């Protein structure tokens, strides 16, 4: 597995933070780093496989990667990221207690992926731009200024994420996307889902298409196919059982959609013929 080292990314041996844009981020094999990373998705879509689990990511997704996590990107479509790298929560000169603003593992579950709305994403861009323009000077005021900007970024992400609740349409859509991530296998009536999240059906279609580039049903199908591919790789269940488990009522239809999405059949994935994509 590829290991990325801080010496190749940070401007100096003492710099606590570095900014790495990926515009766009192409498919990238599994790797880990000797530093921590906040991945901010600007726009586009892709699959983020994080510690073996696949997540659909799009504009407004924020992922917190620790120095022992492994991850990869695949099936990317104009996926543009900004990576904010930092050595560790304890490596700052003027900041303490940062763990309280970061996601925390509970009962073995690490909530690595947050979502922020488009208004917050614009504020994030402005903060990141300030961090990029702060320069690499290592005198005390310059270091303090960069650390303050990093703290402001964490506070903004925390306040804007789903964890803090939300009230506007943009935020309701984020809640809906998070709900689909957990309930993708259920039968979905879009009118009922729109009502559940206090959105009009037209607003749901328009905003989801704007944020992901996909219609609601196309997004749901892709989500189901991603989960199915994960099971094909990591379980012994039959193709038919996996199709039903992931919300498809007909295994032949599932196989057709699967090949159309990934250019491989479910049987190819089961036999490991897609190694080039991993």
Curated annotation (Swiss-Prot):
Residues 174-272 form the HTH araC/xylS-type domain. Its main location: cytoplasm. SMART domains: HTH_ARAC. Keywords: Activator, Cytoplasm, DNA-binding, Repeat, Rhamnose metabolism, Transcription, Transcription regulation. Signal peptide: none annotated. The record marks 241, 250 as: Interaction with sigma-70. It is found in: Cytoplasm. It holds the Pfam family HTH_18. GO terms for molecular function: DNA-binding transcription factor activity; sequence-specific DNA binding. GO terms for cellular component: cytoplasm. One of its GO terms (biological process) is positive regulation of DNA-templated transcription. Residues 191-212, 239-262 bind DNA. Activates expression of the rhaBAD and rhaT operons. Binds DNA as a dimer. This is HTH-type transcriptional activator RhaS. It comes from Citrobacter koseri (strain ATCC BAA-895 / CDC 4225-83 / SGSC4696).
């Amino acid at each position: 597995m590829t290991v990325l080292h801080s010496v190749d990314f940070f401007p100096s041996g003492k710099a606590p933070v570095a900014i790495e844009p990926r515009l766009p981020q192409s498919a990238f094999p599994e790797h880990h780093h000797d530093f921590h990373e906040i991945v901010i998705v600007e726009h586009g879509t892709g699959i983020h496989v994080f510690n073996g689990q696949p997540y659909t990511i799009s504009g407004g997704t924020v992922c917190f990667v620790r120095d022992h996590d492994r991850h990869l990107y695949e099936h990317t479509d104009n996926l543009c990221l900004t990576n904010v790298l930092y050595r560790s929560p304890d490596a700052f000169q003027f900041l303490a207690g940062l763990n309280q603003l970061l996601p925390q593992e509970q009962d073995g579950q690490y909530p690595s992926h947050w979502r922020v709305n488009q208004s917050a994403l614009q504020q994030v861009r402005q903060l990141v731009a300030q961090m990029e323009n702060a320069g690499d000077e290592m005198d005390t005021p310059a270091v303090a200024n960069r650390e303050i900007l990093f703290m402001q970024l964490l506070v903004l992400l925390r306040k804007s994420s789903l964890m803090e609740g939300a009230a506007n349409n943009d935020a309701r859509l984020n809640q809906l996307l998070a709900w689909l991530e957990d309930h993708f296998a259920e039968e979905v009536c879009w009118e009922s889902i729109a009502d559940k999240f206090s959105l009009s059906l037209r607003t749901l279609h328009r905003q989801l298409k704007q944020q992901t580039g996909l219609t609601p049903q196309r997004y749901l199908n892709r989500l189901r196919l991603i989960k199915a591919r994960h099971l094909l790789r990591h379980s012994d269940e039959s193709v038919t059982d996996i199709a039903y488990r992931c919300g498809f009522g007909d295994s032949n239809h599932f196989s057709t959609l699967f090949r159309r999405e990934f250019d491989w059949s479910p049987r190819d994935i089961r036999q490991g013929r897609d190694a080039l994509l991993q």
